[in-house]
Amino acid sequence: MPHLPPLGLPARRRLAGALCALFATATAHAGGWETVSASRTYNTIPVESDDTVNPLRGYHRWQNQELVPQAAPALDAFRRYHWRDLESVQGQYTFGAILADLKAARDQGRKYAFRLRMMAGYDDGQLYAPAYLAGNASCLHGCGFWADSGAASGKTWVPDWNDPFVLARSRALLQALAQAIAASGNGASIAWIDVGLYGQYGEWAMRKSVYANRPAGIEEAGTDTRRAIAQMHFEAFPDQQFVMFIPYANRDALHYALLEQTITSKPVGLRADCLAQAGYFRQWTDHPDDWRQFADQWRKAPFVAEFCPFDSGQAGPATARAQASEFHISSVGNANFALSKPDNQRWLSLSEPEQHDMLMLGREAGYRYGVDSTWVSLTADGQLTLAATFRNSGNAPTYEPWKVRLEIVDAGGVARWSASVPVGLNSLAGGAVTTSVQSSWRVPALAAGSYALRLIARDTRPADGQQRHPLAWVLSERDADGGLTLLNLRSR
């Protein structure tokens, strides 16, 4: 603070001294900041009208389809592949379809999820495993058998899941795919991988009827086999996000994947293949002690799902919406319903209440991050303080490495200064939970002009073209890129 002249001096000398003092003050502040002390509150978009599209929440693109109307294309896409299309001759792999889909997702600003399958239909007479596998002499009992599982005229080829050769070739397939994806340079564009291969559609479920007349020596998949199939996925892709199918019969494999193994760098999530089927989750709620082991896995790894075809009664959108809410499901495939209709008629075939439930499911599933309030203080010499309260009004957290940044942005949109705000979005599990933080920084002098002070959540992964776009706050005041301008600053 400048020293003013003593009051006892003559008036002319006191005036001259005061002018000198004021000049000294202005000089001290030259190149500094205009002082600020401002508080502000923000408006969370009501869930009923929230059409925000964010990664790994709401609806994801399913088999190149997005049937429930959304405000923007999904930021995650999922597809599944038959083993026979990836390895027609033993040891000769054709991963072109997967690599092309993965690259397309990257080029479109999405991330990609997939599953490999050894079976894909009952009684259709199709062999979905490689032709070389059926009847291969390296297997103890022919690697599998043709079963008649129902009234349809065709038969179903059932692999001998326990056979060492079948397991070895499955492991080789996954290892070769991992190498091909690594060589493509697009591995960071994977959203998640289903632990697949085993079971019908690779979904870890089998009709017991197919084993009624099985050949001697062939048995249902044992617990060691199921663990081995999960393990080979993890060993091939140890740093990717996995999700695991939830049939109750696989509880031992789930225990291994979620609670025992230490191969994967990320916790393994859950996968439901029959959302909307009334009573589907009773397989777990009827066994509460068993479910208790996995019930909170959603807090640290994603729970994703796809629909069972809608039937009459309780099997439909209302049931799916309730299940997604109760079990904290983050992302649902945006297709695979009303299968009796052509693709362009499926959405229109739903009643108005059913359409409402489908829209609300997408709005409610997963995280909904916002900012309740902020207080900003900036001194002339660049001491910047932020106090902020963050909220997750969704039903689950994010599972990706977002970092909230405070940025000073010039008129051209270039961040001239930024700092990390000490808030972990992953720790805000949902249910309107909030957390408040306060931090201070010393901001350097910047060129004279006006700047925007912004809060933005950015993907912390390497900037190699595979980063997510900034997370969009669910706030009425948010900017076009999803960030939030708190106020304008002025450097002198």
Task: Label each region the model flagged.
Residues G32-F165, Q293-S349:
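N-terminal substrate-binding region of glycoside hydrolase catalytic domains
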Residues D194-A236, V243-W298:
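Substrate-binding cleft/loops of secretory-pathway carbohydrate-active enzymes
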Residues G144-V166, L173-P215:
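Active-site groove signature of glycoside hydrolases
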Residues G17-A26:
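Bacterial N-terminal signal peptides
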Residues A28-A30:
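Boundary at the C-terminal end of the N-terminal hydrophobic targeting segment
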